[in-house]
Amino acid sequence: WGAFLVSIPFLIVIVTGILLQLKKEVEWIQPKTEEVAIDTLSIRFSDILSISQGILEAQIQGWSDIDRLDVRPDKGIVKVRAKNKWEIQIDLERGTVLKTAYRRSDIIEQLHDGSWFHPSAKLWIFLPTGIIILILWLSGMYLFFVPILAKRSRKS
């Protein structure tokens, strides 16, 4: 019964886990991070906001529409992640937009841990699923190795 109870949540975890493993390889999942050579980080936060407001897909009116800024000085960029899941990559020296793309990896991560369905699903469905799968795996390993170990002990 354990396998039957966890089959759907486990399938979701497997599929989304595979997608998350590929997020750096497949640009459809997560936009590739651009790199630029820079001498100085010369743009200000106010510049980042005004540049981001010019990207219509991101629907940014003010700071409240921005989920986070991911500053990468070693790559010379800042990633602006809008609350509507659009990502804007901006050159930190010249302030030019290097890339805009929809970021699906966040939704896939929420599906993977169950929080997309409901905040409680993470702890009340997906955590027990993981525990049941661990128990099933341990019992499967036990059933696999016990006959092998029994044969070895009979031979000696």
Model-derived features with residue positions:
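Conserved histidines in hydrophobic membrane contexts and catalytic metal-binding motifs
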Residues: 1-156
